[in-house]
């Protein structure tokens, strides 16, 4: 369970959000909505422990992430605007490196993940030679390799075609059905039943 308790964020003397409270239970898929500048990315970074709140705290499994940072990060997969893809490595090598960091190397799973994001035939191309959209697909392929319970995804559908969006939507729903938590922002319309997708709107 993820809890956001009384979180206030002020940037450049402007209040982005104030005394924000909500709880996300295991098995939930949540979309953060709001106008540009409402603080969606800032909120995701605060929840992920990558940014600071002026007031309030984030709790994971009933403990503050400040006191439980190691376990929290072991449960977290965060994908932000910066993909974290290493330009000098191939698409395959990037995912192999990601798996090696988590002591979970599986070559067949890497090939499968790259195929699922539409990069079959591009596995051995250096990431620096891929388009920005293809680099983002490399980053998204980590989702198929992840055993993290909490996914925090900032605009994961950027530069993804309609078929790719459908594939990712199914992945998000499957992760939630297996007891995981997906927290995301997107400017695209999601074709997910309202019973399976909850929305939290900032700026209102």
Curated annotation (Swiss-Prot):
EC number: 7.6.2.5
Gene Ontology MF term list: ABC-type heme transporter activity; ATP binding; ATP hydrolysis activity
SMART domains reported in the protein's UniProt record: AAA
A GO BP entry: cytochrome complex assembly
Enzyme class: translocase
UniProt key word Nucleotide-binding: yes
CC per GO annotation: plasma membrane
Catalytic activity: heme b(in) + ATP + H2O = heme b(out) + ADP + phosphate + H(+)
Binding site for ATP: 34-41
CDD domains for this protein: ABC_CcmA_heme_exporter
Annotated function: Part of the ABC transporter complex CcmAB involved in the biogenesis of c-type cytochromes; once thought to export heme, this seems not to be the case, but its exact role is uncertain. Responsible for energy coupling to the transport system.
Protein name listed in UniProt: Cytochrome c biogenesis ATP-binding export protein CcmA
């Amino acid at each position: 369970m993820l809890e956001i308790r009384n979180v206030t964020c002020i940037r450049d003397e402007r209040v982005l959000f104030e005394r924000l409270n909500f709880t996300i239970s295991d098995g939930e898929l949540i979309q953060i909505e709001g106008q540009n500048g409402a603080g969606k990315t800032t909120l995701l970074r605060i929840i992920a422990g990558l940014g600071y709140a002026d007031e309030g705290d984030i709790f994971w499994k009933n403990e503050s992430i400040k006191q439980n940072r190691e376990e929290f990060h072991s449960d977290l997969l965060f994908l932000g605007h910066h993909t974290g893809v290493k330009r000098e490595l191939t698409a395959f090598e990037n995912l192999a490196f990601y798996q090696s960091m988590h002591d979970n190397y599986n070559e067949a799973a890497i090939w499968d993940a790259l195929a699922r994001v539409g990069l079959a035939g591009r596995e051995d191309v250096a990431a620096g030679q891929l388009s920005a959209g293809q680099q983002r697909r490399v980053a998204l392929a980590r989702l198929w390799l992840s055993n993290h319970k909490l996914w925090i995804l900032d605009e994961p559908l950027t530069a993804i075609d309609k078929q790719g969006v459908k594939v990712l939507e199914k992945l998000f729903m499957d992760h939630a059905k297996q007891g995981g938590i997906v927290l995301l922002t997107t400017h695209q319309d999601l074709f997910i039943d309202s019973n399976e997708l909850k929305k939290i709107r900032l700026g209102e």
